[in-house]
Swiss-Prot record:
The lineage of its organism: Eukaryota, Amoebozoa, Evosea, Eumycetozoa, Dictyostelia. GO terms for biological process: cell adhesion. Belongs to the csb family. This is Uncharacterized protein csb family protein DDB_G0271178.
């Protein structure tokens, strides 16, 4: 039986407004400190103006996963790229400006 993967959602506020991106999350390995968050989302949706650009700067933000919330520190930066239009995959990376109080985990 396949393990159910929780729905994943990122909400970000920038100078352009509020945006969210959500989908099914697949963990990827990370090494630097503070480690960037890298997510591969399938069946994703994008709401808001910020993610029409492939790079963004975070004023405030949060990650929602498995019923928990994780803050994204102010002044963090991020980028995204479509990995496969046929499979509806997107990669989102957030480069943290500092270590958050509550670190995102799987």
């Amino acid at each position: 039986m396949a393990e159910e993967v929780p729905e994943f959602k990122i909400t970000i506020f920038t100078d352009k407004g509020r945006s969210t991106i959500s989908g099914t999350e697949y963990p990827l390995p990370i090494l630097p400190y503070p480690a960037p968050y890298t997510f591969r989302l399938s069946g994703y949706t994008i709401e808001g103006p910020i993610l029409t650009n492939k790079e963004f700067k975070v004023i405030t933000g949060k990650i929602e996963y498995g019923g928990e919330e994780f803050d994204i520190p102010p002044s963090s930066k991020g980028s995204w790229r479509r990995a496969d239009n046929l499979m509806n995959l997107i990669f989102v990376t957030i480069y943290l400006s500092r270590q958050p109080k509550k670190v995102f985990h799987y």
